[in-house]
From Swiss-Prot:
Listed GO MF terms: 2-oxoglutarate-dependent dioxygenase activity; iron ion binding; L-ascorbic acid binding
Domain called Fe2OG dioxygenase: residue spans: 78-178
Name this polypeptide is given: PKHD-type hydroxylase PP_0862
Binding, 2-oxoglutarate: 169
The EC number(s) this enzyme carries: 1.14.11.-
Cofactor info, note text: Binds 1 Fe(2+) ion per subunit.
UniProt xrefs under InterPro entries: Oxoglu/Fe-dep_dioxygenase_dom, PKHD_C, PKHD_hydroxylase, Pro_4_hyd_alph, Pro_4_hyd_alph_FE2OG_OXY
Required cofactor(s): Fe(2+); L-ascorbate
GO biological process: DNA damage response; intracellular iron ion homeostasis
SUPFAM superfamilies, per the entry: Clavaminate synthase-like
Keywords: Dioxygenase, Iron, Metal-binding, Oxidoreductase, Vitamin C
Length: 226
């Protein structure tokens, strides 16, 4: 399941973020890649724990926790702190699958990467290339969103970032460990939750709503890991 979550940051916020990123000291993106992924990764990244990355990441996670669409789709349990990257001068990341487990720097806790997320920080007109290409059950999806928009997709997906041939592409990315690890089960719960919300708006007093809501929670109880 791929999910587009728009408008997490406004234009003024994004302009300030990009201005700060232009002044930042960047490191080789291979630092946080696994052995196989490092062979395909050609980009820049703010070092893990960088103050600016923490500031952007904290604001992003705080907003997502207040975004019902994200909460319903991801059912988040743990989140790996967001990282910030930059693609320019032909920078790219070849096809790869993200590592199954991630351990935040300085933390003993590990995060299972059930879901991957990319928040676009650059206006799409400001750079050429840089599409996030995801292979899923419906074929190949090419994603290049407006600045401030985010895409959520299964961590099991084979994906790449096309070379950036003009300008620079800033983005935040992170992983979520869901309460429900199976993507098909999460998708079913998301569809049920959407149906419940729509029925609540259309026929709020319908007696079947109580039964449907109960079924949702019973399925969540069966599948959730806490």
């Amino acid at each position: 399941m791929l999910l587009h979550i728009p408008g997490l940051f406004d234009a003024d916020e994004l302009a300030r973020i990009r201005e700060a990123l232009e002044r930042a000291d960047w490191a080789d993106g291979k630092v946080t890649a696994g052995y196989q992924s490092a062979k395909a990764k050609h980009n820049l990244q703010l070092p893990e724990g960088h103050a600016l990355a923490k500031e952007i990441g904290t604001a992003l996670i705080d907003r997502l926790w207040k975004t019902p669409r994200f909460m319903s789709a991801a059912l988040p349990h743990k989140v790996f702190p967001p990282l910030i990257n930059c693609y320019r001068d032909g920078g790219n990341f070849g096809f790869h699958i993200d590592n199954a487990l991630r351990q935040p720097k300085g933390s003993p806790e590990r995060v299972r990467t059930d879901l991957s997320s990319t928040l676009f920080l650059s206006d799409p007109e400001s750079y050429d290339g840089g599409e996030l290409v995801i292979q899923d059950t419906y074929g190949v999806q090419q994603i290049k969103l407006a600045a401030g928009d985010m895409v959520l997709y299964p961590g099991t997906s084979l994906h790449k970032v096309n070379p950036v041939t003009r300008g620079q592409r800033y983005a935040a990315f992170f992983w979520t460990q869901s309460l429900v690890r199976d993507d098909s089960q999460r998708a079913l719960l998301f569809e049920m939750d959407n149906a419940i919300q729509q029925l609540t708006a259309d026929v709020p007093d319908h007696p079947s709503l109580l039964q449907l809501t109960g079924t949702y929670h019973n399925l969540l109880r069966r599948w959730a890991e806490v």
